[in-house]
Amino acid sequence: MPLKTAETVMRGSREKTTERARRLRQSDNDAEGLLWLELRARRLNGYKFVRQLPIGRYFADFACREARLVIEVDGSQHAGSDWDAVRDAYMVAHGWSVVRFWNGSVLTERQSVLETIVAILDGRLRENVVAYDMRFLMGRTVIHD
C-alpha cells in the first residue's frame, strides 16, 4: 500500500469538502433557491456571492467573501438551536458577519430580506440585531499572525 503524503491527505480532504458542498447546493430548499436567484451573478448591487462555502468545519448557505458576510436561511428546526449559536460564534470569531433569516421571511418578504442584506453590505447596519424574523452578528476584526 503506498504511503500517504501530506499532499494526498490534503487533496482527499479538499475533495470531500467539495463533494459535501456540491450535495448541499443540490439539496437547497425553496427559500434558499429563491434567494440564490437574487444573489447569483452579482445581481445584488454587484456583490459576488457563493453557495455552501466551507468555513472551518461549517458550510455557509451563502457568503460574500468581499464583505465577509454569511447569509443563513433557516427552517423551524433551527429555532433556539445551540448548534447555530456555536456555529455563528465560530464564524464571527474568524471575521465573518452572520445574518440569519427564516425560510418564511425569504418566501413572503423577499424584498425586505434583500434590503436588509444591502444595508449590511453598504455598512448601514453596524451593530448586532436580534429580532423575531432575523438575527445579525457583526464579525470581529481578525489579526493574522
Task: Cite the ranges covered by each PLM segment.
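Solvent-exposed, charged helical/coil patches
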Residues: 1-47, 124-145
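Basic, amphipathic alpha-helical patches used to engage nucleic acids or provide basic targeting signals
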Residues: 22-28, 51-121
